[in-house]
């Protein structure tokens, strides 16, 4: 089963994809969105769904550190509902607390990307990878 992982932000959506066996996640791209113009990035997502023959989505659920839900959780769930309506595919959610911080650490410490502009270009994709990989690891059938 192939899934797209999404890190939903206010201006961008980081996108990752799983392999066909649902074992690993890899980064794909960052899609610019503009909620004020009702541009939610559905056109580029449609291309990716077709290209990778996707079976569903995994969205990050940005809960507060104490486990409560805030406005960002509502945004992710609303985005998930749009995806279900547009594509008719299942949408799953994965706790994304600290994924952006972890992404930044990986990019600086492991990949050696110290340039802030370069990091900004891939941080949403990396967060999407972590969201999807966490989901895959939790749901792996050994």
Swiss-Prot record:
GO molecular function, one term: nuclease activity
Annotated Gene Ontology cellular component terms: cytosol
Enzyme category, top tier: hydrolase
Documented EC number(s): 3.1.-.-
Cell compartments where the protein resides: Cytoplasm
General function of this protein: Could be a nuclease involved in processing of the 5'-end of pre-16S rRNA.
Protein name, per record: Putative pre-16S rRNA nuclease
